[in-house]
Amino acid sequence: MSTTNHDHHIYVLMGVSGSGKSAVASEVAHQLHAAFLDGDFLHPRRNIEKMASGEPLNDDDRKPWLQALNDAAFAMQRTNKVSLIVCSALKKHYRDLLREGNPNLSFIYLKGDFDVIESRLKARKGHFFKTQMLVTQFETLQEPGADETDVLVVDIDQPLEGVVASTIEVIKKGK
């Protein structure tokens, strides 16, 4: 049995909190009949308990989670033509762990500037938002460079429908 299907592809929607990863991935998955996984669902219990107590996760905490996402991507890619995973993937070495061993994985970076994302977060109903949380996300973000040729960029300074359409266009073009 083959372990990979080269006609199938995984797209990891990445970006800072508030960039629209979950909303975009959910709608794109619906329109393309693609598999969809919110990466947060695979956090180990220890990470969930740590976050619930207000402690930020460190790189050591994230490593088993990123490995679980890599395994999930591998499994999804075997049976689904297009699969979408939501994961902030803010640091290059996080992206390296996610792509390890899977040449059929690309990233879609939902890119927006601080002001655009801050205004969206403030507009969310029933969402507790602290500006410092977004500042920290941008400080942590290592924007993909030219050496990361598997990263596709979608500008999010447009309505959700436009971001969804741009994301679908990027997927249909391939890498």
Curated annotation (Swiss-Prot):
Query: Is-annotated flag, keyword ATP-binding?
Result: yes
- GO molecular function ontology, one term from the record: gluconokinase activity
Instruction: Please give the Pfam families that the UniProt record associates with this protein.
Output: SKI
Q: Give the highest taxon in the source lineage.
A: Bacteria
Keyword Transmembrane set for record? no
List of residues binding ATP: 15-22
Which pathway does the protein contribute to? Carbohydrate acid metabolism; D-gluconate degradation
Which cysteine-cysteine pairs are annotated as disulfide bonds in the entry? none
Task: State the CDD domains in the record.
Answer: GntK (cd02021)
According to UniProt, the reaction catalysed is: D-gluconate + ATP = 6-phospho-D-gluconate + ADP + H(+)
Q: Coiled-coil segments, which residues?
A: none
Mind listing the UniProt keywords for this protein, alphabetically?
ATP-binding, Kinase, Nucleotide-binding, Transferase
Give a GO biological-process term: carbohydrate metabolic process
Q: What EC number is given for this enzyme?
A: 2.7.1.12
Q: What family does the entry list?
A: Belongs to the gluconokinase GntK/GntV family.
**NCBIfam families tied to this protein:** PRK11545.1, therm_gnt_kin
Name the PANTHER family on file: GLUCONOKINASE-RELATED, THERMORESISTANT GLUCONOKINASE
- What is this protein's record name? Thermoresistant gluconokinase
